[in-house]
Every structure is written in C-alpha cells, then in structure tokens.
Swiss-Prot record:
SUPFAM superfamilies referenced in this protein's UniProt entry, alphabetically: Glucocorticoid receptor-like (DNA-binding domain) (SSF57716)
PROSITE patterns: RIBOSOMAL_S14
Organism: Mycobacterium marinum (strain ATCC BAA-535 / M)
Gene: rpsZ
HAMAP family to which the protein is assigned, alphabetical: Ribosomal_uS14_2_B (MF_01364_B)
Family label: Belongs to the universal ribosomal protein uS14 family. Zinc-binding uS14 subfamily.
Cofactor or coenzyme needed: Zn(2+)
Quaternary structure and partners: Part of the 30S ribosomal subunit. Contacts proteins S3 and S10.
Residue runs in coiled coils: none
Superkingdom of the organism of origin: Bacteria
Cofactor note: Binds 1 zinc ion per subunit.
UniProtKB keywords: Metal-binding, Ribonucleoprotein, Ribosomal protein, RNA-binding, rRNA-binding, Zinc
Record-given protein name: Small ribosomal subunit protein uS14B
Function: Binds 16S rRNA, required for the assembly of 30S particles and may also be responsible for determining the conformation of the 16S rRNA at the A site.
Gene3D superfamilies assigned to the protein according to its UniProt record, in alphabetical order: 30s Ribosomal Protein S14, Chain N
Length: 61
C-alpha cells in the first residue's frame, strides 16, 4: 500500500498539467498503471484471474 499522504497528493490537481501522474485506484501504486483500467499490473492480474473485470480473459494460443 502507498502512503496516504502521497495518494492524497496525487489526487490534487497539480499547478502544472505535466506534473500530474496516474496511481492505481485499488492500492495506490504509482508505477505500471494501465490507464484503461486505472489499475497497476499486479491488481489488474489479480482481478482478471478472479473474473472481476468484464471482457478480460486469459489468452491462450
């Protein structure tokens, strides 16, 4: 889990638009966040395996 202060800081609108960054909506992780889902790679994988993300399925070929 991310520190609450950093999560709150990221939620505020920055003074300059380029300073804004994405965080995982579930755990607050700042890196490897998929914008389409708003989740980090770890949470995305866990939720996809649990079937909590509609339209996402494990690929096999």
């Amino acid at each position: 889990m991310a520190k609450k202060a950093l999560v709150n800081k990221a939620a505020r609108k920055p003074k300059f638009a380029v300073r804004g960054y994405t965080r995982c909506s579930k755990c607050g992780r700042p890196r490897a966040v998929f914008r389409k889902f708003g989740l980090c790679r770890i949470c995305l994988r866990e939720m996809a395996h649990a079937g909590e993300l509609p339209g996402v399925q494990k690929s096999s070929w």
